[in-house]
Amino acid sequence: MLQCNKKAENGAMSWLDEVKWDAQGLVPVIAQEAATGDVLMFAWMNREALAKTAELGRAVYFSRSRGRLWFKGEESGHVQTVHEIRLDCDNDVVLLKVTQLGHEPGIACHTGRHSCFFSVLKDGAWQAVDPVLKDPESIYK
């Protein structure tokens, strides 16, 4: 379990108050593979998602399109175990150091790839350079 559930004297989680939330109450989050340093994905968290992530040791994001908490892997089984939660120097970006579970190597992207950052700009065009590890249609039934 992560060591960030310390409550202030008034019962509130004071460490959450140090995060600079945007006007919608969200903070951008980067998920990075702890073992390799690979950047897996970018997402958003609200206060509840960040608190749940710290409590569970599992990545919980806020889905802007669904308007609700999104427990990473709830549909795909591709869960992210969180080893460390970091806050950047401006307190407005969160970095999760994770182990991506559910497939070997771990699949973080809904396209069936290890990382959501699979396109590289080459000669003025975006080219997919990382392979699809599993057909998304077989992941999301």
UniProtKB/Swiss-Prot annotation:
Gene Ontology MF terms: magnesium ion binding; phosphoribosyl-AMP cyclohydrolase activity; zinc ion binding
Record note on cofactor: Binds 1 Mg(2+) ion per subunit.
Required cofactor(s): Mg(2+); Zn(2+)
Pathway info: Amino-acid biosynthesis; L-histidine biosynthesis; L-histidine from 5-phospho-alpha-D-ribose 1-diphosphate: step 3/9
Key words, A-Z: Amino-acid biosynthesis, Cytoplasm, Histidine biosynthesis, Hydrolase, Magnesium, Metal-binding, Zinc
Sequence positions that bind Mg(2+): D88, D90, D92
Assigned EC number: 3.5.4.19
UniProt-listed SUPFAM superfamilies: HisI-like (SSF141734)
Enzyme class of the recorded protein, top EC level: hydrolase
Cross-referenced InterPro entries: PRA-CH (IPR026660), PRib_AMP_CycHydrolase_dom (IPR002496), PRib_AMP_CycHydrolase_sf (IPR038019)
Subcellular location: Cytoplasm
One record GO biological process: L-histidine biosynthetic process
An annotated GO cellular component: cytoplasm
Chief location bin: cytoplasm
Reactions the enzyme catalyzes: 1-(5-phospho-beta-D-ribosyl)-5'-AMP + H2O = 1-(5-phospho-beta-D-ribosyl)-5-[(5-phospho-beta-D-ribosylamino)methylideneamino]imidazole-4-carboxamide
Binding residues for Zn(2+): C89, C109, C116
Record function comment: Catalyzes the hydrolysis of the adenine ring of phosphoribosyl-AMP.
NCBIfam families per the UniProt record, alphabetical: PRK00051.1
Subunit structure: Homodimer.
Family that this chain belongs to: Belongs to the PRA-CH family.
Protein name per Swiss-Prot or TrEMBL: Phosphoribosyl-AMP cyclohydrolase
Taxonomic lineage from the root: Bacteria, Pseudomonadati, Pseudomonadota, Betaproteobacteria, Burkholderiales
Underlying gene: hisI
